[in-house]
UniProtKB/Swiss-Prot annotation:
Belongs to the G-protein coupled receptor 1 family. Disulfide bonds join 80-169. SMART domains: 7TM_GPCR_Srsx. The keyword DNA-binding does not apply. This is Adenosine receptor A1. SUPFAM superfamilies: Family A G protein-coupled receptor-like. GO terms for molecular function: G protein-coupled adenosine receptor activity. It comes from Gallus gallus (Chicken). Receptor for adenosine. The activity of this receptor is mediated by G proteins which inhibit adenylyl cyclase.
Amino acid sequence: MAQSVTAFQAAYISIEVLIALVSVPGNILVIWAVKMNQALRDATFCFIVSLAVADVAVGALVIPLAIIINIGPQTEFYSCLMMACPVLILTESSILALLAIAVDRYLRVKIPVRYKSVVTPRRAAVAIACCWIVSFLVGLTPMFGWNNLNKVLGTRDLNVSHSEFVIKCQFETVISMEYMVYFNFFVWVLPPLLLMLLIYLEVFNLIRTQLNKKVSSSSNDPQKYYGKELKIAKSLALVLFLFALSWLPLHILNCITLFCPSCKTPHILTYIAIFLTHGNSAMNPIVYAFRIKKFRTAFLQIWNQYFCCKTNKSSSSSTAETVN
C-alpha cells in the first residue's frame, strides 16, 4: 500500500539527498586522485581509498536505504534487517580504515628508515582486506541471530512462519539495542577510537621530540621529514576527530535508550545525530583538499584536465611530486 510522505519526512529526505550528492562525487574524486597521481600511491593513501570507498557506499547505498526505512514500508522481517545492516558494515569499515591509517602514521615516525620494508603494498592490501572481512562479520551479526525477531514474535501470532512475518520496517524494530551498545559500541567503536587517540598522541610526541632536537647542517633532512609528517598527522587526526564527533552522539543516544527506557529522547535530536553520521562521509574530501597538498594538487589536475578542458602540461611534473 502506498504511504504518503509527511512534510517532516520530505525535509529529512531533502537533507539526506543533499548529503549524498556531496559525498558520492567528493569521495569518487579522492579515489580518482589516488589512481592518477603517483605521489599518492603509498600505504597511507591506500587506506584513505578504502575509507573513501566506504563513504561512497554511504552516499550511494546507506542513505537511500535510510530514506526507505524512515518512510517505514511494510516488509518481511529479514528484508528489513538486510536494509539496516549495510550502515553497520560501512561504519566498522571506516573505523578500521582510520585505525590502519593511525598505525601507518605511527610506523612512519617510529621506524622511518625501515618503514618501506615493513609496510609493503602487499601487506597494506592484506590489512585492507582483513578490515573489510571483519567489518562484514561485525555488521552482519544481526543477520546471524542477534536481532529483535523474538521480541517482535512475542507480540504476534506464533503460528505465523518467519517468511510470512510482515512488519513496519524501522531500524530499532529489527536491530537489537543490546547489540548496538554492548557489541557494536563498547567493543567495535569505542575501544578503536580510544586506541587511535593514544596512537596519535604518541605520534605527535615522537614528532615533537625529533623537531626539538638541535638543528645542524646534517639534520635538515630529518627536520624537513618530520615537519611534513606533522602536517599530515594533524590532517588525519582531524579526520579522526570529525568521525568521532559525528558518530558519538548517535551511540550516546543508543546508550540512553538502552539504559534509561523511560527517558524520552526528542526525535529532532535523533535526526540531527543521523545527519551527523551520514554527513561525515562528505567531510573527508574537504579536509583532504584544504589540508593535504598532494590531494590539493591532484584535485586541481583533475579539474584542469577534465572539467576545464585544459591540457595542463605541467601536470606530469606535479604528478611526480613527493611532498608528504
